[in-house]
Design a protein with these regions (language model features):
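PLP-dependent aminotransferase class I/II
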Residues: 326-366
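Hydrophobic/aromatic beta-strand patches that form the interior of the parallel beta-sheet core
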Residues: 52-54, 119, 143, 165, ...
Length: 366
């Protein structure tokens, strides 16, 4: 038996995509956001209470968040309410919209698809955890490259107890698209697999060429068309760190999301490295499901389930960090400043390559 709130969310997902509902894990089906508890009471009081709102565990003083001067004196230009109060579990609305706008700016192909609005996570690692909780059961197959970040092992081998299946990341000096194809070919029709792809790749730094990205997307869609049920997590932690003009500039998510009902796409990304704010811990998770409407029942339910997982673990992510990132994204100099840092990083990359040219013994390392 599910909680009535979970039942309601499950019905919203099934109404638009029975296939997407079938991909949820047992926890994914059980989880819900407690929309009728203290949080909804507080939201209602915020709108309707004329003088007093005693519904949530914060204290006010002089119509602002009660605070210590020794704290707020360190934050010039930020009000106590922006720095110290709780953010919604799904994230500040203005940040979610600002990140959505950034996704569309960076990925023009996304203009043709309808995705969820990004939900704010406590960094990219947290987004990986949310994705696993929503879609991976013990014993499920998780497909990922042999060159991978060790956090995948913690999340999917240990936390969810999935069966990890590795494909060789490289085919010579190129992305091993045939290896992905071969790994997916072992998934029988009707069976679910959770696929993790990360570009630029950690630890190799490799970013697919444009034609490799197109071929990889087609392989994923081909297997969805033949009946494999795929949840594809695109880990865009290092998005934007492209140092070769031939590299695919748009996220793989933009090529595969909303293209087939047997392929549920997830984009995990973060301000961490895109905005050079490693310790602020602001990440995002976005869903792409075929035939789901932006703002429609399915995405509202998916966002609520993600918010429920956040509520159950960290409750909500730092409002102060979210305010800082939201203001940065709203700054008219944001894209120019980001491009300048990417230029510096690109110069460092090329210098390493130049030095290694005189050391052929390291040719396989870079």
């Amino acid at each position: 038996m599910f909680n009535p709130l979970a039942e309601s969310l499950n019905g919203m997902i099934q109404s638009e995509s029975p296939a997407a509902y079938g991909m949820l894990s047992a926890l994914g089906k059980r989880i819900f956001f407690p929309s009728k508890g203290i949080l909804s009471q507080s939201a209602e009081a915020k709108k309707l209470a004329g003088n007093f709102n005693a519904t949530i565990g914060t204290a006010l003083e002089g119509h602002a968040a009660m605070h210590l001067d020794c704290v707020m004196s360190q934050l010039p230009g930020i009000t106590p309410n922006d720095a110290l109060l709780y953010a919604p579990s799904s994230g500040l609305p203005q940040l979610r919209q600002a990140w959505m706008d950034k996704l569309l700016h960076d990925n023009p192909q996304m203009a043709d698809i309808a995705t969820s609005k990004p939900v704010v996570a406590n960094g990219l690692s947290h987004a990986l955890s949310i994705a696993g909780d929503l879609f991976v059961d013990a014993g499920d197959t998780v497909i990922l490259p042999d060159m991978n970040w060790d956090n995948y092992l913690l999340n999917y081998a240990e936390r969810t107890q999935a069966q990890l299946k590795f494909f060789p990341f490289f085919d010579g000096d190129a992305l091993n698209v045939r290896g992905v194809d071969a790994a997916l070919a072992e998934i029988p029709e009707g069976q679910k697999a959770f696929v993790v792809l990360n570009f630029p790749n950690n630890p190799t730094g490799y970013a697919p060429l444009e034609e490799e990205g197109a071929a990889l997307a087609e392989v994923l869609l081909d297997h969805a068309r033949r009946g494999a049920r795929l949840v594809v997590l695109v880990d865009d932690a290092y998005y934007g760190l492209f140092y070769d003009d031939r590299c695919m500039r748009q996220s793989l998510f933009a090529r595969i999301a909303c293209r087939h009902h047997n392929l549920l796409a997830i984009k995990a990304d973060a301000a961490t490295k895109e905005c050079y704010v490693w310790g602020l811990r602001v990440g995002f998770i976005t869903f792409g499901v075929k035939d789901a409407a932006s703002g429609g029942p399915l995405y509202r339910a998916m966002e609520a389930k993600a918010a429920g997982l956040i509520r159950a673990t960290v409750s909500n992510c730092s409002e102060l960090s979210q305010i800082v990132v939201a203001r940065a994204l709203a700054n008219p100099d944001f894209y120019a400043e980001r491009a300048e840092k990417a230029r510096i990083m690109g110069g460092r990359c090329r210098k390493v390559a130049e030095v290694l040219e005189s050391h052929p013994e390291y040719a396989q390392c870079f």
